[in-house]
Amino acid sequence: MQNWIKFLTLFLSSFLFAQQTTFKFDFGTDRTENGFIPITSTSKFDKKIGYGFMDISGLKSVDNGGNALTGDFITSDKPFYFSVAIPEGNYNITINLGDSKGASETTVRVENRRLMLNDIKTKQGEIVEKQISVHVKDSIIRNQNGEKIGIIKLKPRETKYLHWDNLLTIEFNDKTPKVSSVVIQPNPTAKTIYITGDSTVVDAQYEPWASWGQMFPYFFVPNEVVIANYAESGETLKAFEDRHRIDKIWNKINPGDYLFIQFGHNDQKAGNSIKSGYKKRLKEWIGKAKQLGAIPVLVTSMNRRVFDESNKIVNTLDDFPDAMREIAKEENVYLIDLNAMSETLFEAMGPENSKKAFVYYPANSYPNQPTVLADDTHFNTYGAYELAKCVVKSIVDQNLPLKKYISKNYKTFNPNKPDDIDRFHWPESIFMESLKPDGN
């Protein structure tokens, strides 16, 4: 009888948890704040209960006494990942970081290394409360009644991505990450910026690859704006349609939301006609976004790292950037000319130093990498961060309505004077792969 009661209790608690959209977790020991779920160093993720750490090795519970919520915490000497089974949507996440008897240093990312909090340092005895806003997605396309009407055709490699696994995963990283609580609440009012594009935009899961899309959330005020990155490596405008990625967005986007569109690298290689294919689809997307009350923003594709004998960037994208500029004028929509800004940025870096922004690494720098990595299209985390700042700069300089949502994390930026790479902060995640993303 006792076993049956225990089973029934576990089943009911699991069922109720699965229906929840608000969650309160007290990290540390079994000494727990009222109304919070205790999370200790042994709380390994369990599908039955719907939450826990991806890996508990190296985790340490510390209890300093005092306040039940902030007097204890979880820490580790390596990155650790906390996952929660949660319905797709926009969420605010409130996190308490610090140590009532010591100092801490924490960087927070979500899903596929999407940057949220960078190098948050607390002094001895200091506890800080930080908020981030996150978009959680799945591959199912639903109508307004929530009924399934389709599905995104994911590529095989996408099945391993953290942003398609029906979980919200939070990465805690840095020298001394110390987490005492995590509260997750729905955010139904935030503007959503939907991003479409290819491997130069995607939330890349594996070090050393990165894109501006996954750095973008760091520069926005939480609660007001949420970034929803639907880009994927190797995609063209046509492929984005064929795999129903854009259909997913059309069924989710709301009036006042934004649709960022950056394609060109793969459209060029696919032999798509600028006139009958590329421009036609751009116009159709712009028209559909406007029809739904959303705000389209065109982003020209950044340059590849190809220099001429005078150390000037060579245009390898044919007429695709110009075609997008023309469409922006014809359709009277916002344009972020990342193509022009990247030319300035890369020329300021120069042929040799610009390698530090791309995936250029000696053999054996990463697992299963017997040969050198030398990629003139795809960026590392530093390059992706610099390009994200270019996009934000354009928003600010053009006085786009989104300007009022830019956070204090963005100070100012001049592509003629790139940030010093030695001052760029990025503790690497545990996910690493030398395989080049789709597309070029």
Predicted regions and their residues:
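Bacterial Sec-dependent N-terminal signal peptides
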Residues: 1-20
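Short catalytic helix/loop segments, enriched in acidic residues and glycine
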Residues: 45-53, 209-222
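Alpha-helical cap/lid subdomain in secreted, periplasmic
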Residues: 111, 244-408, 416, 420-421, ...
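A short beta-strand-loop structural module common to alpha/beta enzyme folds
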Residues: 223-237
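Structural motif
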Residues: 236-245
